[in-house]
Amino acid sequence: MRSEFPTRKQVEKQKKMETVKRLKSDWRYPTTLLCIYGFFSTVKPLEPFLIPFLTGSDKNLTTEQVNNQIFPVWTYSYLSVLVPVFLLTDWVRYKPVVVFQAITLFVTTAMLLWANGVPAMQAMQFFYGVVTASEVAYFSYIYSVIDLKRYRKATSYSRSIQLLGYTVGSVLGQLLVSLNLMSYRNMLVFTLVLTGIALLTSCLLPMPQQSMFFHRKHTRQTTTTEGIESHADGTVDATERTIRSKVSLEETTDINVEKSTEKEKEEGKNTDKSEDLETVGGESCGQVLVQLWRDFRQCYSSRQLIYWSVWWALATCGYNQTVNYVQVLWEHVQPSQNVSIYNGGVEAVSNLMSAATAYGIGFTEVRWDQWGELALGSFSGLGAVALFLMTFIGNIWVCYTGYIVFKCLYMMLITIAMYQIAADLSMERYALVFGANNFGALVLQTIITSVVVDSRGLALSIIPQFTIYASYFSVIAVVFLLRGLFTIWRAKRNKRETTSSDISDSPGFVEHRL
């Protein structure tokens, strides 16, 4: 007679399947995979030595070709695909774009290794622009597969691991170059292997069931507490402070949202998933875009947010231009064919010090709403001084030091700006403002590139370029210094008026008798 009870092997197999299922449903599983992808996709030992590689015997390109014909393509590519990739990322629910980013990064590295000539390198820069635009999928993916209460930890891990990858790549590249352990081409082969690992890891990521705009979580229940309305799809009114971020670490702190989300997950086991998700069809895509436009207008109706966003766009534009072309300046000051260079070590130090600066700013007790604009102007001025010293001193160690100082100042200020902007926005609106500010920075960067750098424009050499960048930050400093001084003067005037009003309105002395 056949036994109806499961055998020992069947029980063990069932336990293993349950264990695997439990691990995959835990928030650590997608976070770990994403961090592995983020690490291997950012370890690039050759990146600090890209100019010596392109202008050396491997590619035989001139500095003018790299500066005026090849590098500008990245800016144009990035601008042209940023908005389509941003919308497509949400439409296909993140993972396909993460995989696509890994594929294009692999193609970029392969072209850098095997392709030759200016047109081929321009095509390589185009693909790298697509890689950069696809970065939005990396930072957005994790929010669609974990609970709201895990946002801060997951964001911290995913951003920190990228910084670790860049730092490890820079240090590794410096060691390989300084000790003559590997040629530039072999370093690219090594990078290709790491990119292949990142590609395989991206394929293992779980597919999200929801997204921020086109596949929202749907529920009929809406809760209101103390006049603040919160919805189970994760959106909240703009008046609620739902994001407490040090370096754009988004975390919704509303308790009702967390409870409703957890309740949905428990009830979701007994209900059809189609009831929990509201997928936007083709007819509703226009409605989503209209809603995005309404949110955009409402976000930028705040004058304070506009000031911070203007600085964000202006400073990010100048920062990107400086970082993109700083290796050309280093090569001009001290050609790599003559002496040893330490680009990798400088990049590693700048990354670590920038991270420490951005982290430390979160523990400073300052009223940024009052003193923030003055800080933006003052530290932007220091950044301009660093750029002027890099441009005119003509010493490689001054260039290295100025670059580290400039990068630390920018990272500190962009952290303050991110926090101030995020303080009164829901996650969806913060993502919208974040994308709009970066798009504005990219438009400005494209204008500067086409006029100043491109061979079809002025095609200036590197010293006039950096003179313009330093002057650019000087203008930013003057504007925000004046604005900051005005803000402080107005705050003190309002305080005096309030004090005078309180004194004049206070009742006379009344004697109290027992």
Functional labels for PLM-detected ranges:
Residues S3, T7-W27, Q209-Y307, D502-R513:
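Juxtamembrane intracellular "pre-TM" segments in multi-pass secondary transporters
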Residues R8, E12-V81, T108-M111, V118-M121, ...:
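Helix-loop boundary and gating motifs at the non-cytosolic
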Residues C35, F39, T108-T109, N116-A137, ...:
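Hydrophobic core of transmembrane alpha-helices in multi-pass small-molecule transporters
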Residues F71, T75-V81, R150-L181, R185-V189, ...:
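Glycine-rich segments within core transmembrane alpha-helices of 12-TM secondary carriers
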Residues L79-V118:
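Conserved MFS/SLC helix-loop-helix module at the cytosolic interface between two early adjacent transmembrane helices
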Residues S80-Y94, L175-L179, S354-G372, V453:
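Helix-to-loop junctions at the C-terminal end of transmembrane segments
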Residues Q101-G117, G129, S202-L204, S378-G394:
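C-terminal ends and interior cores of transmembrane alpha-helices
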Residues R185-L205, Q465-G484:
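Symmetry-related core transmembrane helices of the 12-TM Major Facilitator Superfamily/SLC fold
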